[in-house]
Amino acid sequence: AGSAKEEVEKALKAIKQKAKFLKSDVEGVYKIRIGNAKKAVKSLSKLKNKKGMFEHTFYWIPIEKWITTNVNAMQKEIKKLQKGIKKTDKWKMDLHKRHFDKMHSTELIIKLTEAVDKPKVDLENPQKIIEVQIIGNKAGLALLNKDELLNLSGK
């Protein structure tokens, strides 16, 4: 069947994307530098029902910026990202953390959403997603449309 890394390489080849694997401190999590990550994930989404394509990889999440896991720094970056959310857009924040125990997830979400001044929160059917991926002392942030995120965990 092959490894997860081979699967990543095969999937990216299928959408004609070249990628560079970066150092990751978490087993099972790949950090990949790629041209247009949002476009790549959209293309991968079209292949999600192809048999044998995604047997080892379940989450494909584009990150726009990596910063330190300092709450103030994250709030500052989220304040910039949220400018891409219209007042009429429904939005939510997704937070995933690994090797970070300085703050409980709920407390952290409350702190980070304080930086967002858009009124329409919708956890079930958002138009925009503020993605926060914390891995140790680094936080990856992105503002995504629903189709720029690939979650195959429930397939």
What is the role of each PLM region?
Residues 1-155:
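SAM-dependent transferase fold signal centered on methyltransferase-like domains
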